[in-house]
Amino acid sequence: MQFDHYHIRLLEQSDAAAYFELIDTNRPRLEDIFAGLVSQAKNLEEASAFLSGAEERIKAKTYFPFVVVDTTSGRLIGFIDVKNIDWNIPTAELGCFMDTQHAGKGIAKKALLLVIEYLFNTFDFLKLLIRTHESNSAARTLATQCGFGIEGHIRRDYRTTKGELVDLLYYGLSRN
């Protein structure tokens, strides 16, 4: 998938160093929002182990981690993962973040819209979900700009890196 000078593709084992750099550079702002990803990439070795596991999950179609690559620099500048997949419906949850230097430029919206189209057309998902904390205005805006509607406010639904249980807003998008 491509747009402007960006390419979206699945994360690969050869991305270990670049993936770790993306996480590490953005760690302070990701720690509570992407607790799982951050906790599995404390160093390059852990990031590499995460990628090995991710490759197996991709083959099993239980997880799809996509990266947004700046084709002019070759750098990974964003991450979109498809997780909590339920093939019985089929439905999945999306998570997304951009490198702080590329946030707020509309890149995430274009990338997410392409991934959504890909998921609906390639895997016949009937519904996609985004969960976010109510204070994450960027994620809430991104969800609504991509056609998601708020479906609920779930209390004490997510444990942050610091161990705090927080409420989440659920946004859903059904295939037309």
Which functions belong to the PLM regions below?
Residues E31-G53:
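Conserved GNAT-fold acetyl-CoA-binding loop/helix
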Residues Q13, D24, A41-S48, T62:
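Generic alpha-helical scaffold signal
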Residues M1-A18, L22-R29, P65, V69-N176:
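Acyl-donor (CoA/ACP) binding surface of acyl/acetyltransferases
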Residues S39-Q40, S52-V67:
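A short helix-loop-beta-strand connector motif used in the catalytic cores of GNAT acetyltransferases and
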